[in-house]
Amino acid sequence: MPEWIVEEGIGEVRAALVEDGEVLEARVRREGVVPAGAVLDAKLVAVAPRVTVEADGAQFLLPRGVSGVTEGARLAIEVTREALGGSEPWKRGLARRTEAAPAPAPPLAEGAKGTIEAWDELLEEARTGIVRFEGGELRIQPTAAMTVIDVDGWLIPAKLAQMAAWAAARAIRRLDIGGSIGIDFPTLHGKEERREVDEILNGYLPHPFEKTAINGFGFAQIVRPKLRPSLLELAENRARFEARALVRRAGRSIGGTTVTAHPAVIAAIDEGWHKRLERQVGGAVTLSADPSLAMSGGHVH
């Protein structure tokens, strides 16, 4: 039976729904980012061009707008999507006005605390955006408009689309992909072929979601709730992503150790993380920058 495992890490909290050692679903909550579900006391700082409030040192957009208040007014908000990271205005956190009292966000998941053994495999999928399955592979790319899933393989189109539908539904859960998702299947000429692929998606995707039927060109669009960045979006900030992964590996050491990585990754390990890592391993941790290493090539010894 699948069980949630919650891993309290340095820089992030990780949660995974695991069955027989396989991660079925994963979530990440970054340290220092206000999570979805939190209710905050906020200040309205702008009504144009976007309704913007400020709370807990961060700015949030209110897509539904707000009426009856002017700039400088105080109001309660509920965070509906965490900030995605990045300087673009649309990547700020999203919120809505509420009458509820300030309260923390609910837990990332309800489960036992422990170590997620298959986490490194999941990170590799997030790094590359490539998910392999029998007969082909998915290439997944986040864009400003949607996350695009392209299907490639060597099976006949109908069989490839069926296998890809299962793999895409699995990847959407594993990589925590929400919001608008486009899947570009092979062209399917028959209605029955398209119906079979639709049924696979409907059967494997967890609710709630909305989905268009697959059109004659093999394209389907899915819309799921989006509470936080997907693992793919987190991987776009590569230095920070690799820094968190490396600190996680280093945390398994006992006593003094040396962490060697690309200079950008070393620079992304802030002082607070470094000190906590030393306390966790029970010894001095030396950070060593090596420009010859790839961003994902860091090691601990």
Features from the language model and the residues they span:
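DE-rich acidic low-complexity regions and acidic surface loops
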Residues: 1-301
